[in-house]
Amino acid sequence: RLYYHTSAGIVKALDDVSFTLHAGETLGLVGESGCGKTTTGMALLKMPSPPGRVEENSQIIINGRDIVPLSDSEIRKNVRWQEISMVFQGAMNSLTPVYTIGKQMLETLREHKEMSDKEAQDLMEEYLGYVGLPPEVLNRYPHELSGGMKQRVVIASGLFLKPKLVILDEPTTALDVIVQAQIINL
């Protein structure tokens, strides 16, 4: 359950939404704009837009563990990116313009995993390769990349910690048809 608590009252954005996914399964949410697809993804990450919040009597079970009671710092450190990652609609706009792609990807890795510089470099290059980007992209700034390249950087970042659940919110919008097919088959 995700409710928005406003001065005009409570708005029940998500109420009694339930689904089960097993390893290797894919689930697609389809609906008109504003029906709650993105909100569902945000709820799974416990990241609702204010004044929304995941209600305490809700359950979000990941690998047998309910993450609703976890604190924001526990979610940030142990759940996001490792258990669940989300590639947001318009994800290419989530890159910070003043840092190189490598610095931004490395920051995510360092926050969640201990590894040597060489291991981190190899992992970042490996996942950029999966989405069809050369290692040189790590030394570039976001403004030096096309929209499709930025989208693929964000997709690679959403995958490189091997989360159990990957939420893709229109992940291929900025990609051409051939690259879309490659990404969907990852």
Where do the model's predicted regions map?
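The feature captures the beta-strand-to-loop junction immediately N-terminal to the Walker
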Residues: 30-31
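Conserved ABC ATPase "signature" region
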Residues: 66, 107, 118-136
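Conserved ABC ATPase signature
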Residues: 141-145, 149
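A short, proline-enriched helix->beta-strand linker immediately N-terminal to the Walker B motif
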Residues: 160-164
